[in-house]
């Protein structure tokens, strides 16, 4: 089996707790270099996980001949920059969701991937978890009957520090960094799972609002959409719900 040597751009929570550990545990995969603009953060991460190299410059990591592929685990505002950098260097990349902070950047990433022939994957790993594989099986074998309509209803109370000011606010509610609010962080997985079950969403309408005014980004979203299969769907997300929504 060919071994893939990964380079990480970003040394935050995603690489520490969520996806990062798996890169060193899957057969044929290992992490050989990490990068963070914060030198201490990069060095300590590398030491903690026994990784040989660390960088503070993304281009240097991408240019490292020992690195075969790139995992991009930074906030969405930099996804396009790093993904395009990797693809232009001939290195496939795996990008945390959302793919980018705005639609235009998503188009740029797709265009560069087509031009270079280098793939760029989004971290929609949940579709491969056993639970969701079982759901897919139940839908496809007819156990659940004919699916006529799909609904998403999500509500959660505000998180700690959501009403903080300036740089103390979570980056996930700062549009210049995240692209939007928590919707950008949480909804992609839900919509991806539905698309795996019912085909691509071919038409959609969304209605964002800011109800609580705790931060600049939207905190409530309503949407309607239709899948490739013809099944209609609707959804609502509220990130400033009552405490009972926990």
Q: Where in this protein do the model-derived segments appear?
A:
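Rossmann-fold dehydrogenase core element
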Residues: 108-126, 146-148
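Predominantly a Rossmann-like dinucleotide-binding segment in NAD(P)-dependent oxidoreductases
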Residues: 126-214
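N-terminal Rossmann-like dinucleotide-binding module
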Residues: 1-49
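Core-facing hydrophobic residues within beta-strands of well-ordered domains
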Residues: 3, 29-31, 67, 147, ...
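Hydrophobic residues in well-ordered beta-strands that form the structural core
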Residues: 15, 55, 95, 120-122, ...
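Beta-loop-alpha module in the N-terminal Rossmann-like domain of NAD(P)-dependent dehydrogenases
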Residues: 38, 49-112
